[in-house]
Every structure is written in C-alpha cells, then in structure tokens.
From Swiss-Prot:
Keywords: DNA-binding, Transcription, Transcription regulation
Name of the protein in its database record: Putative HTH-type transcriptional regulator protein PtxE
Taxonomic path: Bacteria, Pseudomonadati, Pseudomonadota, Gammaproteobacteria, Pseudomonadales
Coiled coil: none
Keyword Ribosomal protein applies: no
Molecular function GO labels: DNA-binding transcription factor activity; transcription cis-regulatory region binding
Amino acid sequence: MLNPVWLKSLVAIVQTGSFQSAARALGLAQPTVSQHLQKLEEQVGVTLVQRSRSGCQPTTRALAFMPHATALLDMHARALEALHGNRERVGASSNIGTYLLQPFVRNYLTTANERGEVDLRIAANPDVADQLLAGQLDAAIMEWWLPHPDFEYRLWRVEPLVLIVSPDHALAEAGCIERDRLVDLPMLGGEPGSGT
C-alpha cells in the first residue's frame, strides 16, 4: 500500500519543481520531504525524481504516475471525509444550480443540526448524470432524468416552457401554444442535453 504522506511529497516536488518549495508548500522540513521520496522510490522500485545541482526533474515514470498519485490522494481524502465529514455532494444542471437551488442550499446550511457542508457541482445535465452514475455525487437535481434501476428519482417541480418571440411574430398573441405548431419553426434552445 502506498503511503499517502509520501505521495503528497512526490506530488508537491513535481508541482513546485524543487524539494525546498515542496517542503515549504507542505509545511515540512526539506530533509523530511527528501526522506518521503526516498521511501516511496524504495517501495516502488523506480527512480521518480532526478536530482542535480541545478534542481530536480521528474522522470518519465513519475510523470506517467502523477495522474494515479493525485487520484489516490483524492480518493484518500474522500475516504476520510466519508468517515469523519458531513459533506453532501450535490450535482445540479446549469439552470437549476444557478437560478433555483441556491436558496435551498443556503437554508440547509443555516438549519443543519450538525456541521453540514454542501459540495455543489454545477454542470451540463449529461455531465451531472455521468457524475451520479460514477458515484461522484450523493444526489442530483436535473432538468430531465432517464430512469435507471440503481436510482430513485422524484419530481421536484414543474416549470413552464416559454416561447419568446418578437412582438410582430405570428405567435406573439397566441397564448398557450400546442406543440404541433412549433415543430417546423426555427428555434434557439439550451445546450445539447439540457431540458430546454
């Protein structure tokens, strides 16, 4: 098992470009960061950083490993959060997250009995659905939902779909318009995957 403390040191070295800067960023002594890297290199059996008088450079293997190291650190942080935290990961499609959800989040944060936090992620509807399916969200509020056997869904609210036309357009005074009258009209709508 890779030690997350050692991984943090490697990531800091690669990101800052030096042992001294990495130590400063981590709030550690420079020899401690060097020791972390040495132990990690011994464990994995490859050199991760080339040291020279002019500084240090990550090896090709270190660069290939970096996405995995950062993913492991992220997973480690999420695991600790799951054990000790009270953070809800909520995804919302763009319009909902921007215009409708904010007062509900604020109300939750001010009335939660425990110290609660909300990690609100606003994205396009398809991206929110993908994050929910990947287990990256605890809940999602979306403009549309295709039923999925692993999830329970509930209708939160219904918003009217409004047609906006110029005052001289034939439909300007039409009131409620049947869907069939709209089929052949050129229209601008929301981004692909949105509910509009």
